[in-house]
Amino acid sequence: MNQEYIKVRGAKEHNLKNINVDIPRNKFVVITGLSGSGKSSLAFDTIYAEGQRRYVESLSSYARQFLHLQNKPNVESISGLSPAIAIDQKTTSKNPRSTVGTITEIYDYLRLLYARVGIPYSPATGLPIHSQTVSEMVDIINELPQGTKIYLLAPIVRGHKGEFKREIMNLKKQGFQKLIVNGETCEIDDLPKLDKNKKHNIEVIVDRIVLDENLGNRLADSLESSLNLADGITYLEIVELPTAANTEYEKNQRITFSEKYSCPVSGFQLTEIEPRIFSFNSPFGACPKCEGIGKEFFFDRDLIVPDHRISIKDGAIVPWGSTSSKFILETLKALAEHYRFSIESPFSALSDNIKTILFEGSGEEAIRFEFHDGSKTQVIHQPFAGIIPSLQEKDRTIESVLIKEELAKFKSEHKCTACNGYRLKDEALCVKIVNIHIGEVADMSIATLQQWFAHLEQKLNKKQLFIAERILKEINERLKFLMNVGLDYLTLSRESGTLSGGESQRIRLASQIGSGLSGVLYVLDEPSIGLHQRDNTRLIETLKRLRDLGNTVLVVEHDEETMYEADHIIDIGPGAGIHGGRVIAEGNAEEIKNFEESITGRYLSGRQTIKVPTQTRTGHDNRAIELIGAVSNNLDNVDIKIPLGTFTAITGVSGSGKSSLMIHTLYKAALKHLEPTAKVFPGKYQKLKGLEYIDKIIDINQSPIGRTPRSNPATYTGAFTHIRDWFVELPESKARGYKVGRFSFNVKGGRCEACQGDGLIKIEMHFLPDVYVKCDICNGHRYNRETLEIKYKGKSIADILMMTVEDAMQFFEKIPLIYEKLITLNEVGLGYIKIGQSATTLSGGEAQRVKLAKELSRRSTGKTLYILDEPTTGLHIDDINKLLKVLHKLVDMGNTVLVIEHNLDVIKTADYIIDVGPEGGDKGGKIVVHGTPADIAACSESHTGRYLKQYLK
């Protein structure tokens, strides 16, 4: 029966208060509400989780063991549910082999296109490569010395899985006796059983020949047989050369012959032109030097000696420590004596020649080393290997993972010198379409690529066009979808690990539209994140198109424009955490405005707003940080000035260069200056001035505050340290002799050892997801019975960890050290979270605000530069209002706050704006305009200014 609604009854997951809701099917539905109100609990943890669980449960038990089965959500019933697909922001692969091209499958079609219509060119001559005839092959073989023993091999299997019983049976029937299987020669009757799940190489020994003048047609006949067996390819293996032969060839050398592709001048040959040779994830295509990563790692002098101001004796050479090793100290003393320098001088005082010898070694020059072991002295004359060669040798020979990780701290990366960062073998890069190889195509932006493909059809001949027609259609469709979701600035070669959550979500959204599915429930988590207002309209049209295909589109969203375009809105609230979890309002945007209890409605109707400041700050006496000549990524020799003591916003369309300018260049360069040992690699620039005016630079990002369940807001902000100190001072604790460690769940003593302070025990299930059960020894309290007997105002330390920030504030009202830490968490809008809530359960926005709270609670020097990249991610407009008060408070304390932001409510409150653009990718990287919000709004060339104008009225 085709139902009209997805009916949810009795939803109680997380903070949901037994809610009932009817979601119209085949509509564009927005779920909104304050951060932490229960939107994701309804959309993802209830509706999507149940849809996914029902699908997985329908599979066989064998299939289920390979899939993650969702726990049944806490809901009485859900009817009218369709197959569910979640497009969230947490599933970006960090694998360096995953790229925009591989995620969207465009690169797979590109590989097919190049394999079918690409033309190979000789790297040596630049001429097209032609096939070899059997006669040409015979002539090449006859150039070998007479008496050379050779094998002619037919490679019938090259890197494929299987047992190949039929192929081997056919070879037996044809009379072949010997094979080379995975490098081992064996009789065809004694062939070992092949593992069908492993890749194999099988070569038939077609003929064994000793070259002489009387061979007649035997060579040509054997070549033809071999070529027929292996689809036009044969190998010649030199088994033995005559003793007195003077030749460039070597024993065991292989020569590849192909009826298809071979350069007559240089001898460069292609065994095949198949899609796999264009794959950097295949051994047939990957560059052998970087193994398809496109990067090489090398020991970096600047990481080995990060601070040139200190001496060798005091530890300038970091991997060699502070020369506590007697052997290292005596080695360095011998070098200093030989080359007449002092290990007590600052490293910067050493000559370039001495530095080169220290890093690279003394070459052939022997040095007198004198080593003492207490009882005797040993004198050795030998060259000095050098710091870098010594580290390379250690890295190559050591097996300890810990030591390898330690050595990795001294490595940097650069483009692979063999493939120039293209990831592929020369064989793949020599195949071109209209003089462009596949690596160059992958480096084009989506917008440039779309234009290139638009003109490509005119440049292909009739045969090529006939072959490529369907491939081009698939590629063009996918490019169009990526353009429609505002990702025209990305390149296909961009690693997926470098994408923001919003970018990766929109890529998967584009892929879903390309799949053309209907009758599906799509659940999306804030797809507008990271998107400039200009591109938002295109995104909304894409979501509508997904709906028009016959799907239900359920979007967790705070964006006003999206709400106005939605068919239906569900507002969860009224507050966050325990104050939320109810359906406050339902209807379209106009209807939501009329609900008094709806905070969303108040902002939509204009009853509540974020006010434009009446005046802007001008900063500290014209002091500024000045970055000159930034050229990282797409930046076009950019110069900027950031006035200190202001709230400055960096704006611009997606991909314009904001993060390249602020994070990759300014932040990393300033951090490197303030902390020379920091392992950061700034983008290229000429000068950075004004750093003498700041003492710290802090990037408050959305990365987790901890990786384990034991990390929580109380431990991160330092509140828990004071809470433990307070418990230690209680009379009962003193009487028992308890120390601070007694109240820690990270060390033995006071914690429950059954669960090691986690409060939960993990039980592995084979056909079901792992189950976490409450520890039955401590009942989930994390501590042992004796520790829990210590109470303050009737509450144990475990009870306090279960309190919300609001409750804990009231509880510790009279204890300033604890209260001050908690009040900052409340100020950033996190009053609803539990102070002991696991860090792994906090959203990116919540983690960022916990970090902000920690900064607020510090004693301010008034000389800190804070950088925040899109701090409004995941925030309701009311939360943004609270966040702005906190950020402006930091500025009022004398600090400088720099935000990269698209949200116009934030931008309009800035003292100073730097607009980067005008477009994304190659068409960006310039400063369009800078100044006050009014200056930006007055600039006709600024996309930001055009939209900002409406917000300043």
From Swiss-Prot:
Disulphide-bridged cysteine pairs: none
Leader sequence segment: none
Keyword ATP-binding: yes
Superkingdom of origin organism: Bacteria
GO terms, molecular function: ATP binding; ATP hydrolysis activity; DNA binding; excinuclease ABC activity; zinc ion binding
InterPro entries, A to Z: ABC_transporter-like_ATP-bd (IPR003439), ABC_transporter-like_CS (IPR017871), P-loop_NTPase (IPR027417), UvrA (IPR004602), UvrA_DNA-bd (IPR041552), UvrA_inter (IPR041102)
BP terms from Gene Ontology: nucleotide-excision repair; SOS response
Domain called ABC transporter: residue spans: 320-599, 619-949
Annotated compartments: Cytoplasm
ZnF region ranges: C4-type: 752-778
Entry keywords, A to Z: ATP-binding, Cytoplasm, DNA damage, DNA excision, DNA repair, DNA-binding, Excision nuclease, Metal-binding, Nucleotide-binding, Repeat, SOS response, Zinc, Zinc-finger
PROSITE patterns: ABC_TRANSPORTER_1, ABC_TRANSPORTER_2
GO cellular component: cytoplasm; excinuclease repair complex
Binding residue positions for ATP: 33-40, 652-659
Entry's family note: Belongs to the ABC transporter superfamily. UvrA family.
Chain's role: The UvrABC repair system catalyzes the recognition and processing of DNA lesions. UvrA is an ATPase and a DNA-binding protein. A damage recognition complex composed of 2 UvrA and 2 UvrB subunits scans DNA for abnormalities. When the presence of a lesion has been verified by UvrB, the UvrA molecules dissociate.
Subunit (UniProt): Forms a heterotetramer with UvrB during the search for lesions.
Protein name as catalogued: UvrABC system protein A
Gene source species: Rickettsia bellii (strain RML369-C)
